[in-house]
A protein has these predicted regions:
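Membrane-embedded and juxtamembrane structural elements of multi-pass membrane proteins
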Residues: 1-191
Length: 191
């Protein structure tokens, strides 16, 4: 079981990397400007691909933000939110965290509680990232961030992002968390 699951994750990773290598650098002026304002020790590269349907980040030492070619480069508000979301993943080293989640799942492949933990931990990573984006861009912008997520999901899936045959889906859960977000005061942290 351990080897089969490790093999599955490894093959998925290698296939994805092969797809990602076919991407091209994205030199949109707004993206270059955004990168200059958000520099960290590790150089971040932004690339574009027509083989993906939603933005993602890969790489640890040389992180890359990969954007779908269909993403409107003229919508600077959406670009800001997308880039900031992926930037938070990079700053927090979420790639390492996700590798650790997968390693624990490989070792404890037989335990259904660990499978549940894997799903919930990945969900919580996204929810936490959304909370950081709201902190960075301002609580007053949370509705426009939520709207951008809905629009991106609708473009990706071709149907309403809030519709699901089986109840709540991940996007509607994220939207709900974004809209309920409240900035924690210093006094609340002290208590």
């Amino acid at each position: 079981g351990v080897l089969l699951l490790a093999l599955y994750f490894s093959i998925s990773y290698l296939r994805s990397m092969r797809k990602f290598r076919m991407s091209i650098p994205d030199n949109t002026p707004y993206i270059r400007e955004w990168l200059n304002a958000h520099q960290i020790v590790r150089p971040i590269e932004v690339r574009s691909s027509d083989l993906i349907s939603s933005p993602l980040t890969y790489g640890i030492l040389h992180p890359v933000i990969l954007l779908p070619k269909k993403l409107d480069r003229n919508d600077q508000v959406a670009l800001k939110y997308v880039l900031t979301h992926e930037y938070v993943h990079i700053r927090r080293f979420d790639a390492i965290t996700k590798i650790l989640f997968a390693a624990v799942l490989c070792i404890h492949w037989f335990n259904p509680l660990v499978w549940g933990m894997y799903v919930l931990a990945n969900r919580d990573t996204e929810l936490s990232c959304d909370a950081w984006v709201i902190r960075m861009t301002g609580v007053k912008n949370r509705s426009s961030y939520a709207l951008m997520l809905i629009k991106m999901e609708e473009k990706r899936s071709g149907m309403s992002a809030l519709y699901s045959h089986f109840g709540k889906n991940a996007i509607s859960e994220r939207i709900e968390a974004i809209m309920k977000f409240k900035k924690t005061s210093i006094w609340a942290c002290i208590l």
